[in-house]
A protein has these predicted regions:
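Sec/Tat signal peptide C-region and signal peptidase I cleavage site
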Residues: 4-9
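Compositionally biased alpha-helical segments
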Residues: 10-66
Length: 179
């Protein structure tokens, strides 16, 4: 009973995937979790149920709800903690490029740390947000280090005591799109 009470005291279940992406799901919308044929099915109220193969999941943990998304850049891979994965913030990673699409109504904080020699942070957002640079060094040889596709207010915070370096390419690659 103590274990059950501990889980109920938490607000989110975090799925730590083997690709270094962590997704959080509100326990209030989690109907059930089923293990079937080497896959894990998460059944959410009023949403399509995501399916993960057992090899995709590194671990599960429980914690508080947060409006902070953490992105750790590294030339060996990008680590992402997205507690809002099922609430309107989708994140994809393509090589060193992190692309975020946010439709959530709350003000989200994106915290960038680490170093990448060829990457980018790109965000499409319907609402204002906070971008915190916490010792980040992003170099993008063929485009911007940070690409903000939002007409809303962006607050940029620089964490005290850190050095942040953003290096854009000398010549941008032609993407054929608005950004």
């Amino acid at each position: 009973a103590l274990c059950i009470q501990s889980i109920l005291a938490q607000e989110k279940m975090f799925v730590h995937r083997s690709d270094k992406i962590t997704q959080g799901v509100l326990l209030s919308v989690l109907d059930s979790m089923t293990f079937v044929n080497e896959a894990v099915l998460l059944h959410l109220h009023d949403q399509d149920a995501p399916t993960y193969s057992m090899t995709e999941i590194d671990s599960l943990s429980f914690g508080d709800n947060s409006l902070q998304i953490k992105i750790l850049y590294s030339d060996t891979g990008i680590e992402i903690v997205n507690p809002l994965a099922f609430e309107g913030v989708s994140i994809s990673v393509d090589d060193g490029n992190v692309i975020i699409t946010s439709t959530i109504s709350e003000e989200v904080e994106y915290i960038l740390t680490g170093t990448i020699s060829n990457g980018m942070f790109k965000i499409y957002s319907d609402k204002k947000f906070i971008l915190t640079l916490n010792g980040v060094n992003i170099t993008n040889a063929d485009g911007p280090a940070i690409n903000i596709q939002s007409g809303k207010k962006v607050t940029v915070n620089l964490t005290e005591g850190t050095i942040n370096t953003l290096t854009d390419g000398k010549k941008y690659a032609d993407s054929g799109s608005e950004d």
